[in-house]
Amino acid sequence: AEPGGFISAFVHSPVTGTVKSIAPRQDLAGTWMTHIEITVADEEVWAEGIDTTKDIVTKLPEDNAFIIDRIKSNGVVGLGGATFPTHVKLCPPPGKKADCLILNGAECEPYLTSDNRIMIERSREIVIGAALMKKVLGGCPAVIGIEENKPEAIAAMTEAVTSLAASSSDYSGIEVQVLKKKYPQGGEKQLIAAVMG
């Protein structure tokens, strides 16, 4: 589904199939929303233009507009609850610039571990994503804030930052910052205060 304005995002199906219906339905909270029902195909087929290779590309594209377009067309959004489109965050208003890019690894909700696991298992991809966003924002420093109760994630992310920085200057200016375990430090304003002081 295509976005309905600048502050909206493409929605892609997680399965191969055919759209059966687009209709208002209640979600789990009882709110009426537009739902897209898909009849799942027997065979998985990827859309044209989707890179399905398992290789991790570490060389950053030169063209910032290309990076933003790929982020937008692939429907990349934040996972903080509002699913805010990432391409919007990477386009500050004219005359404004980012002082620092902060990646939120401060998963402070009790019993949640998805951020922790992805930092352990996909640390290189996260650092590559940070470098892409840092480049689009004009090369500002990037900080990955992780609470001190996640030693495996801290180690994995630090190793990824160090090894990628040694391989290319594209990855300089990215650091892991260990944060005190504090609720609700994962909130936007609390995280900015913790990282920036």
Question: What is each stretch, according to the model?
Answer:
Residues 3, 56, 140-150:
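Conserved short loop/turn motifs at secondary-structure junctions
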Residues 4-6, 11-21:
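Generic structural motif
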Residues 31, 49-52, 82, 88-90, ...:
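Short acidic, glycine/serine/threonine-rich loops at helix termini
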Residues 120-136:
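Histidine-anchored nucleotide/phosphate-binding helix
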